[in-house]
Regions:
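GNAT-family acyltransferases
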Residues: 1-117, 134, 138-141, 149-154, ...
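Charged, low-complexity surface patches
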Residues: 124, 148-149
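Conserved acetyl-CoA-binding loop-helix of GNAT-fold acetyltransferases
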Residues: 121-134
């Protein structure tokens, strides 16, 4: 298994490219994180009250600095999602493997932040596909868990795509969906 924190792979398919988020992505990502329609779908659990709604380039740059520091400290990987048809960043996806003495042991925890116009079932399936295929090898995880609030109907449908993964409710939190292969 390659160490994702030493060499972060570029992932993708015909529609989307996922590459580690860098400072140069800030301007385009600001369009995502200033999208008021998108913010309610962002998972900000354990983020010290940050809801990821940013209005300035400086705020976005500061967040990317944090993501880069988190990568260097092996906390998580954050990829920018590029729409191949436009070449522009349309969101980010974060992942890490959680080791714990509970239901989520060896679980890859995933956060997906998208511009609101990309909150469509087929688009989300296409974005998730390359990462879910590689997650066990990249992170050593046995399953993947993410959150999708009830209002995120398209996202919830995408998390039920017939792709070989089994989707189950994540215990006591009705917004958490877990995927197991």
């Amino acid at each position: 298994m390659k160490d994702v924190y030493v060499e972060c792979p570029v992932l993708g398919n015909e529609a989307f490219l996922l590459q580690r988020t860098v400072k140069a992505d800030a301007q385009e990502l600001l369009e995502v994180y200033s999208d008021e329609k998108a913010v309610p779908f962002f998972n900000s659990d354990n983020c010290n009250g940050d809801n990821f709604f940013y209005r300035t380039l400086e705020q976005m740059q500061a967040e990317i600095n944090f993501w880069e520091a988190s990568y260097r400290s092996r906390a998580f990987v954050r990829w920018s999602i590029f729409d191949r048809s436009s070449g522009r960043a349309v969101g980010t996806i974060e992942m890490f493997c959680r080791m714990a003495d509970d239901f989520f042991n060896k679980t890859g925890l995933l956060r997906l932040d998208l511009k609101s116009e990309y909150e469509k079932e087929d688009v989300i399936c296409s974005i998730l596909e390359p990462l879910l295929e590689q997650a066990p090898e990249l992170f050593g995880c046995e399953s993947v868990s993410t959150k999708a609030v009830k209002e995120a109907a398209e996202r919830r449908k995408a998390l039920e795509c017939p792709d070989g993964w089994k989707y189950v409710s994540g215990g006591s939190d009705p917004d958490r969906l877990s995927v197991c292969k």
